[in-house]
Each structure stands twice: as structure tokens, then as C-alpha cells.
Amino acid sequence: MKKLMNNIVAFCAICILSFIWVGCASEGPNEKPRQVEATPNFGVIHNEIIDEIFHSLSASTTRTSKMSKDEFMADCISEAAKTVISKDPTLSRQETEKTIANISMMPLEEIRLGMSDQDRQVIDSIASMLSNNIDANIIDDYIGTCHLDEQKIQAAKAFCETYQESLNYWNKCGAEWVEYIVQNVDVNVDVDEGVIGRWLDRISWKQVAFSDAYYGWYGMMSSGCNIYVGVGGAAAGSIFSALNQL
């Protein structure tokens, strides 16, 4: 019976991958998938920037009253731009902040509407594989079969890497963010441990991570594949997604 169940699971996994591959693969039988170029992990840099934003916000003691949500996001965008420029000093502060704001405040529905049919198919397939815990190397192989230009390859990788790292980050650090937001941002709740606990129970960090992945994709597309500007926009967008859960 155990052997039968293992065979069934393996068969189902093969079926999922075969279905996903059909949409992209039009190669001949001897054509190999395009090798996806190794680049810095978008998701790791993304988490570093979110963490730096949190520590900068937490260290500030100048406010005497709660911020509005708009003021909070403006501070997050400003801190994201500052952090990005510290990593790439050649960037303009004004243009970087403007691009990060445009990325992070773009509604997800509009991001999807702006995608081509192929973009949506590729991203939907990657999302399906991520939901089914398919190995990252297999997802890279899939991206290599999709006949994408270099910018879209990097954007697709950013989607995958952002989801994986964002989910890890929010599962680990989400409680700190919720506590900070409830204490410092006007979200119409009183501060007590019970309220914070109830918010944590209702938040879906997986949903935040998937929203974040779209910001990762859009960040790379909107910044012309400047990884630091793109990841800065995705980091601010991730915080915006978490804020919208409250």
C-alpha cells in the first residue's frame, strides 16, 4: 500500500509539471532549456532592505502621535530609497524614491492587467509550482523553456525568489511589524497583547508573500532590471501588503 501511495504521489507531481511545461515549451525534442543566468538572490536582498527599514523606523523617536497609513508608507518609501542608494551610490535620490513609490503603490490588479498573456501564463505557472513546493532548480529550468528576453527572465526569477524569502521573513518577523504598526500607525485599534494576537491569527503571510512576489516581478520590469531599485520597490510593496492585512 505504501509503495502504491508513493507511486500515486510521484505520478501526480509529474502530471502537474507536464501541464505547466506545455504552455512554454515549443522546442524540438533535442533542444535544451535555456540556462538561467546566476544573479544575486533578489529575495535575500529584499529581506535585508525590509529589515533595515524596520530598524530605521524603530529607532526614530521624533513622533508624538500616531502616523496615518499614508505617512507610514511615505516613511517606508523614503527609508527604502535611502537604503537602496547606500548600496548603489550612483543612483539619484529623487528618481529612486519616485520609482520605488510607483512600484510599491501599484495595485496588484493593475500589475496583472499590464502583463502580456505570456507573462501571466509564466507567472501563474510559477505561482502554482511554488504553492506545490516544487524545487527552485526545477522552476529555473521551467523559466529557461519559456523563450523570454533577459529582462523577463530576471523578473520571473525575482517573482520566485521574492516569494520564497518573503514568506520566510514574515513568518519570522511579522509579529514585530504588527506590534510596531499597531503602536505607531492609526489603524483604529487599541494597543494590547490580545489585539496583536488576534491580528496575527488572521494575517495570511502566504498571501503577503505572493503579493510581494508580484512587486518583485514588477520592480524588475519597472526599473529596467536594476536589482536594487527593483528590490527597494518590492520591499516597500511588501510592507504595504502587510499593512493592508490589518
Q: What are these model-predicted stretches?
A:
Residues 24-201:
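N-terminal propeptides/leader regions of secreted preproproteins
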Residues 187-246:
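Hydrophobic, gly/ala-rich membrane-insertion helices/peptides used by toxins and envelope proteins
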Residues 2-11:
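Bacterial N-terminal signal peptides that target proteins for export
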Residues 19-23:
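C-terminal motif of bacterial Sec signal peptides marking the signal peptidase cleavage site
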